[in-house]
Regions:
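Phosphate-binding and hydrolysis-coupling loops of NTP-dependent motor/remodeling domains
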Residues: 170-234
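OB-fold ssDNA-binding interfaces and closely related basic DNA-contact patches used
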Residues: 50, 60, 69
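Short, flexible beta-strand-to-coil junctions
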Residues: 66-72, 158, 196-202
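Pre-Walker A (P-loop) beta-loop-beta motif of ABC nucleotide-binding domains
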Residues: 30-31
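Post-Walker A helix-loop "phosphate-sensing" segment adjacent to the P-loop in P-loop NTPases
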Residues: 54-64
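N-terminal pre-Walker A segment at the start of P-loop NTPase domains
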Residues: 1-25
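Short glycine-rich substrate-engagement loop in P-loop NTPases that contacts/grips substrate
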Residues: 67-92
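Conserved P-loop NTPase motor cores
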Residues: 34-53, 83-172
C-alpha cells in the first residue's frame, strides 16, 4: 500500500509514517537498488552477502553474485558463483552486486567523472539487466544524491547518533528515525535491519542473517589496508 504524503517534507514523512513488518521479498526485492548504511562493525557487508546468497538460492542459481573491486584477500574466500570485477562495466547481468564503500564510487564531488557516469548507468539500468545493486556506505554525506534517489530501499544496520549529525539534509530525518527505532528495540541488533521502502514511503524492521560462507577471515578482509582496485578511482 502506497502512503499518501503528497508534497510532505522528509521531516514530516519521517515523523508520521507508520511502521510495518517486512518479509524478505518486501524488504529486499530484486531487481532494484538498495542503499545500506550504519556504523562501523554493524554488519552491513555481512548482510549484503546474506542477501546475495538468499536471492541466489531462491532463484535456483539463476541469480549470480558480484563484488566490485573486492580486496585480493576476499576474492579467494568467495564461492565460484560470485564474480569480482574491477570495473563497473564488467559487472554481469542477472546478479546481486555489492559495491562496498560506495561513496568512493558514487561521490557527490566527482559527479561528472567517468566512474560516476558508469555508476549512474548501472543504477538506471539495474531493472533491465535484472540486477540488485547493493550500495554500502557508513552514511550518505559523500554519496551522489542522484544514486540515492534511484534507490528502491534504504536500509540501516544500527546507525550511530554521531554519524547522523553529518548526514545529508535530505536523508537526516530518516536516519534520525532509524537511530530512534534501534534505541527502542530490545534484543540482538545484529539480527535485524531497519528498512525504508523508498517507493511507498513505509518503514519497518526485517530479520537478517549470515551467508553460509561468511567468516571472521572474510570480515577482516574488508577491514585491512588492501582496498582491492580502489586506487583506480583516483
Amino acid at each position: 500500500m502506497v502512503a499518501n504524503f503528497g508534497s510532505a517534507s522528509p521531516k514530516v514523512v519521517a515523523q508520521t509514517a507508520p511502521d510495518r513488518k517486512f518479509k524478505f521479498k518486501d524488504a529486499f526485492p530484486h531487481p532494484g537498488v538498495d542503499l545500506v548504511m550504519g556504523q562501523r562493525g554493524s554488519g552491513k557487508t555481512a548482510m549484503g552477502f546474506w542477501m546475495m546468497e538468499q536471492i541466489h538460492s531462491l532463484s535456483g542459481g539463476a541469480m549470480g553474485g558480484a563484488v566490485l573491486k573486492a580486496p585480493a584477500g576476499v576474492k579467494k574466500m568467495l564461492p565460484e558463483w560470485i564474480a569480482t570485477p574491477n570495473r563497473i562495466k564488467g559487472i554481469p547481468t542477472d546478479s546481486v552486486v555489492i559495491i562496498d564503500e560506495a561513496q568512493q564510487v558514487a561521490n557527490s564531488r566527482r559527479s561528472g567523472s567517468s566512474e560516476n557516469l558508469d555508476m549512474a548507468q548501472l543504477v538506471a539500468l539495474s531493472r533491465q539487466r535484472n540486477q540488485l545493486i547493493i550500495l554500502i556506505s557508513h552514511h550518505s554525506r559523500k554519496l551522489d544524491m542522484n544514486e540515492v534517489m534511484d534507490c528502491s530501499r534504504v536500509i540501516w544496520k544500527k546507525p550511530s547518533a554521531g554519524q547522523v549529525m553529518f548526514e545529508r539534509k535530505e536523508m537526516k530525518p530518516f536516519a534520525e528515525r532509524a537511530v530512534q527505532k534501534f534505541a527502542e528495540r530490545k534484543g540482538n541488533h545484529h539480527k535485524v535491519a531497519y528498512v525504508m521502502d523508498f517507493e511507498n514511503l513505509s518503514f519497518g524492521f526485517a530479520q537478517t542473517g549470515l551467508a553460509s560462507f561468511w567468516s571472521e577471515s572474510l570480515s577482516t578482509g574488508y577491514s585491512g589496508p588492501d582496498l582491492g582496485a580502489m586506487g583506480t578511482l583516483f
